[in-house]
Curated annotation (Swiss-Prot):
InterPro entries named in the record: AB_hydrolase_fold, FSH-like_dom, LovG
Pathway the protein contributes to: Secondary metabolite biosynthesis
Source domain of life: Eukaryota
Enzyme Commission number: 3.1.2.-
GO-annotated molecular function: hydrolase activity; pigment binding
Class of the enzyme per the UniProt entry, highest EC level: hydrolase
Gene from which this protein is expressed: pigG
Family, as annotated: Belongs to the LovG family.
Biotech use, per record: As colorants, MonAzPs are widely used in various food products for centuries. Moreover, MonAzPs also possess wide-ranging biological activities such as antibacterial activity, preventing hypertension, lowering cholesterol levels, causing hypolipidemic effects, and displaying antiobesity and antitumor activities.
Keyword tags: Hydrolase, Pigment
UniProt protein name: Esterase pigG
Species, as recorded: Monascus ruber (Mold)
Cellular-component GO terms for this entry: cytoplasm; nucleus
Lineage: Eukaryota, Fungi, Dikarya, Ascomycota, Pezizomycotina
Amino acid sequence: MPANRSSDDSTLHLPRILCLHGGGTNARIFRAQCRILTRYLSTAFRLCFAEAPFLSQPGPDVTSVYKEFGPFKRWLRSSARDHPEIDPALATEAIDASLRDAMDEDDRRGATGEWAGLLGFSQGAKMCASLLLRQQVRDATRTSPSARDGPNWRFAVLLAGRGPLVSLDPACLTSPAVVDAGGIAMTAFPDERLLAAGTAHVLRLPTVHVHGMLDPGLEEHRKLLAQYCEEGTARVMEWEGNHRVPIKTKDVVALVGHVLEVATETGVLQRRI
């Protein structure tokens, strides 16, 4: 079965969420990791899983369960030693092509719902937030929203996401608070004085942040929320887990509640009376 294929044709008409896997995994693995979440969202959303464009070593703990699920992929460079330099514009083109391929394939399978949201884990969460930021800064320069040449992303769900965000359109966004698409994904956060010097990097579109309280990167995830999201636009879910996608029923139900709330507030879903 192709990585982004849904086995349930009853979701073809539903609004869609594009899902971006973490570094060192792939769309097939992320679909498996999100299997419980997909089930609980299946009455409201269709989830589509995109595959990153660049080859990668497997991520931490990936081979213990998914050793036979390669090849493993990444959206960004994780290290200068393991991943060759790439021109930022070419990197952005490759990322956009991967997203477009997944969306086009889902269209060919008969899906008709609007592309409404983004959902990503770890490096994929960084990319989701960066895609929202690109849309935000591009919309600010347009004379009309109808001039948008892609999906209208209403919200993003960020599981274990960290900054800094990535500028996917340097012509619209140049800020010391963001890095380019050819940079190293694990770059340290900019100095707080640089972050405080402007607001071009600050997301105002709605986000849901999912923080595992046992995740070694928890403080970095909290920094993404505090330094890159406008107050009042984000909601946070904390759960007793490490660096992984929640699968226990109580955690998934809580996460689904946040997704449905933000989808209703943004007009993707109708408010229940």
